[in-house]
Amino acid sequence: MAEEAKVDVKTSAKKDIRNYLCQYCGISRSKNYLITKHIQSHHQMELEEERDDEACEVDEESSSNHTCQECGAEFKKPAHLKQHMQSHSLERSFTCYVDDCAASYRRKDHLNRHLLTHKGKLFKCPKENCKSEFSVQGNVGRHVKKYHSNDNRDKDNTGLGDGDKDNTCKGDDDKEKSGSGGCEKENEGNGGSGKDNNGNGDSQPAECSTGQKQVVCKEIGCGKAFKYPSQLQKHQDSHVKLDSVEAFCSEPGCMKYFTNEECLKSHIRSCHQHINCEICGSKHLKKNIKRHLRTHDEDSSPGEIKCEVEGCSSTFSKASNLQKHMKAVHDDIRPFVCGFPGCGMRFAYKHVRNKHENSGYHVYTCGDFVETDEDFTSRPRGGLKRKQVTAEMLVRKRVMPPRFDAEEHETC
């Protein structure tokens, strides 16, 4: 018995305790951290391949499970996708329970935001001489940041007192953002070429008249300045170059070029995808079909909303359109500034500002002589017939802005 006990002790002492194996080469170690250290030092390529495979699987799962089938929007969580799908539904299940209010919404958070309007405008602007009131507290901070961020600097420069009224402080929670960032003089002195003083053409931050750093578009002939780099990146996508064109719209009469397939698909969905109305048979874009169907629903149509200002007979179908009318016409709020340096013209609507920038108002060439546009003006009613322009006149023509005088021309 004693001899058998000695044999068992010897065999137990020689027992292999290396229980942790490497999954790549099969080597064994006695401790788990030794195997981990071995894998990190000898199997780096295998680990990188596994990480790439896992990332691809995660991307496939997220794209397949959390992508909207209607518009192609992607979400990280299925709850966000479910909430987004409610915006595509025509059913408005969340109805306002306040008397004499027929407002209804597709999402509950939109209803909660609407209920704040019934409680009145409880939040006022903390600045003096500003009577703006808001129903949501978050709009107060947005209003102060937009209209009162440079009050102290403006008072020092212009000498305005506390009792003076600032005409630009008449707005409320306007969520539209202008591409120029609200700076009247952007990139002044660079000739509108979008290049910095060094002449390298990089989009570096520039100092505007309000003291805020802005990034300038480096495209030749553009020179627009933006407050955030993300706005500049979105603007630079509009400058489609021939070497970066990958897709174009093949619809008749369109033939627009795009840098990638995603931009082309979004363009087709918004501009060329039409749906016929089942009620009246009219043809509408897919993005406008929901608004058209609400016109057939008598219960949801609120009727015409009249402007309460005396002497104004304007009527609107939506309260949001009435608010835009009040800001532009009666309050004379013009938040959108022309992006060309030295212009300073302000507009109440963004599309009017864009039309002004795209027109030939700022396109001119400094010539050796002063020439008017009398021969190019349209024929007035009851006036003389317009003269026929010769080829020599077209070659010698210089298009000049109305404010351009002879003295400034001689200095060019």
From Swiss-Prot:
* Note from the entry: Binds in vitro potato spindle tuber viroid (PSTVd) RNA.
Question: Motif Nuclear localization signal in this chain: where?
Answer: 384-391
Q: Which residues form a coiled coil?
A: none
Q: Where is the composition biased (Basic and acidic residues)?
A: 148-188
Its domain of life reads: Eukaryota
Task: Report C2H2-type zinc finger ranges.
Answer: 20-43, 66-88, 94-118, 123-148, 215-239, 247-272, 275-296, 305-330, 336-362
Chain positions of cross-link Glycyl lysine isopeptide (Lys-Gly) (interchain with G-Cter in ubiquitin): 185
Its keywords, alphabetically, are: Activator, Developmental protein, DNA-binding, Isopeptide bond, Metal-binding, Nucleus, Repeat, RNA-binding, rRNA-binding, Transcription, Transcription regulation, Ubl conjugation, Zinc, Zinc-finger
Q: What happens when the gene is disrupted?
A: Lethal.
Please give the Gene Ontology molecular function terms for this protein: 5S rDNA binding; 5S rRNA binding; DNA-binding transcription factor activity; RNA binding; zinc ion binding
Q: What does UniProt note about where in the body, tissue by tissue, this protein is expressed?
A: Expressed in seedlings, flowers, siliques and seeds.
Look up and give the organism this protein is from. Arabidopsis thaliana (Mouse-ear cress)
Q: Which gene encodes it?
A: TFIIIA
Cite a GO CC annotation.
nucleolus
Q: What does this protein do?
A: Essential protein. Isoform 1 is a transcription activator the binds both 5S rDNA and 5S rRNA and stimulates the transcription of 5S rRNA gene. Isoform 1 regulates 5S rRNA levels during development.
From which residue to which does the signal peptide run?
Answer: none
Query: Chief subcellular site?
Result: nucleus
Protein's recorded name: Transcription factor IIIA
Q: Cellular location of this protein?
A: Nucleus; Nucleus, Nucleolus
Q: Does the keyword Phosphoprotein apply?
A: no
Region Disordered: start and end of each range? Answer: 144-207
